[in-house]
Curated annotation (Swiss-Prot):
The active site is at residue 95. It catalyses: [ThiS sulfur-carrier protein]-C-terminal-Gly-aminoethanethioate + 2-iminoacetate + 1-deoxy-D-xylulose 5-phosphate = [ThiS sulfur-carrier protein]-C-terminal Gly-Gly + 2-[(2R,5Z)-2-carboxy-4-methylthiazol-5(2H)-ylidene]ethyl phosphate + 2 H2O + H(+). It is found in: Cytoplasm. HAMAP family: ThiG. Pathway: Cofactor biosynthesis; thiamine diphosphate biosynthesis. It comes from the Bacteria. This is Thiazole synthase. Keywords: Cytoplasm, Schiff base, Thiamine biosynthesis, Transferase. InterPro entries: Aldolase_TIM, Thiazole_synthase_ThiG, ThiG. The keyword Protease does not apply. Homotetramer. Forms heterodimers with either ThiH or ThiS. Catalyzes the rearrangement of 1-deoxy-D-xylulose 5-phosphate (DXP) to produce the thiazole phosphate moiety of thiamine. Sulfur is provided by the thiocarboxylate moiety of the carrier protein ThiS. In vitro, sulfur can be provided by H(2)S.
């Protein structure tokens, strides 16, 4: 069970809605993933249409919507998008994204912290997408963010946990949930993040661009479940030296 702010989730896998070939395929993949929290870019939704091709099937699926401010380049733009999302969707939950460079889509730490502080004061449940910077994550936690979402690698890159060393520090020091976001390319990346102690992962591109998104979503669901179980089982310590699983001492003594 995962708790963030006022909500609890059985699944530790969050999903996105971009890059799917159709809204039907998107919903089928989300259902196969078991995800209960789904991100939604406000720039992709036509709020004037109650039957929007993306929004309507998500509402019907009964998932918790997490609108995001993707496309915002400044704190001011992100705050405006957040207010629009709250008014249109009736939710105070928000994934805060501010990335001024469209080529790399790396989050702006200064603008993100500025916006997060303002949005928390306005009553939002803020989940900020941020770099894997332990100091920044602690500052975001201190201004009241409900969770932190450090990247594993650039958005959509499928590179995996390139920031593993920093993620380990963030996980160790955080008192709010840590959701590894961006760069996760295959189910084993997700399992590794959960084994490390992350509370959840957010996956979009890896599922949406697979030849079979529904099958890939199922694979991610199973990988996340395995990662959670592995962490709960408490793995043995790593050792520099070999440690025989079947010592032969007694057997050899019997032959003497």
């Amino acid at each position: 069970m995962l708790r963030i702010a006022d909500k609890t989730f059985d699944s530790h896998l969050f999903t996105g809605t971009g890059k799917f070939a159709s809204s039907q395929l998107m919903v089928e993949a989300i259902r196969a993933s078991g995800s209960q929290l789904v991100t939604l870019a406000m720039k992709r939704v036509d709020l004037r249409q109650h039957n929007d091709a993306i929004l309507a099937p998500l509402i019907e699926a009964g998932v918790t919507l997490l609108p995001n401010t993707s496309g915002a380049k400044t704190a001011e733009e992100a705050i405006f998008a957040a207010q629009l999302a709250r008014e249109a969707l009736g939710t105070h939950w928000l994934k805060l994204e501010i990335h001024p460079d469209a080529r790399w889509l790396l989050p702006d730490p200064i603008e993100t912290l500025k916006a997060a502080e303002a949005l928390v004061k306005q009553g939002f449940v803020v989940l900020p997408y941020c770099g894997a910077d332990p100091v920044l994550c602690k500052r975001l936690e201190e201004v009241g963010c409900a969770a932190v979402m450090p990247l594993g690698a650039p958005i959509g890159s499928n590179q995996g946990l390139e920031t593993k060393a920093m993620l380990e520090i963030i996980i160790q020091q955080s008192t709010v949930p840590v959701v590894v976001d961006a760069g996760i390319g295959v189910p084993s990346h997700a399992a590794q993040a959960l084994e490390m102690g992350a509370d959840a992962v957010l996956v979009n591109t890896a599922i949406a661009v697979a030849d079979d998104p529904v099958m890939m979503a199922t694979a991610f669901r199973l990988a996340v479940e395995a990662g959670v179980l592995a962490r709960q089982a408490v793995p043995g310590n790593r050792s520099t030296y070999a440690n025989a699983t079947s010592p032969l001492t007694g057997f050899l003594e019997a032959l003497a």
